[in-house]
Amino acid sequence: PMAGITVIGTRPEYRRQGLVRRIMTRAFAEQRERGQALAGLWASQAAIYQRYGFTAAGLNRGYAIDTADIMLLDTGTQNLPTVTRHRPGPVLDTIRGIYRTFIAGRTGYLHRGKALWLETVLGETGANAADGPVYVALVGPVDAPRGYVVYTLRAGHVAHRARPQEIKIRDLAWLDMDAYRGLWHFFAKHDLVGRVAWANA
């Protein structure tokens, strides 16, 4: 298993005393003892962490799509699964389960503790406050959904007279292609939305 490094840093008055190096050296020793040969870090400044043996493993990609450009040419839309919209609280355990299944066969995804879900993915305060309320759309049977999207919907962010709203995707997971197509069809049906943005695709 990979070790995950969380926030690390020193206050300015304690910098350049080797404190971070000591913390990292000790952490690496403990990780080695646990059999963790690899460590991952989401760095604010990648160049700083090269001195500790880290390197960039990927790039962040983002997309912005006009809803008028979302088309499902391969299968059409007649047999797509149902999508239902919810507030996050009642479906948190459901989406956590879908996420765990979704990441099981994929590389680069991290296990998320409840705090990460509540603050980062579903949070409506702090840095996320301007995004507006958070919604979860579940796709598939109500008793066994096959995918979800966590998103916000806000008005006045698209320079279009008839479609001024924007959907911001926070998280998206699907367990089969019908669920994936169903979620994108759900976006396309938002007639007042001029843009679907996914900053961390």
Where are the model-predicted features located?
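Acyl-donor binding region in acyl/amide transferases
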Residues: M2, T10-L38, W42-A43, R51, ...
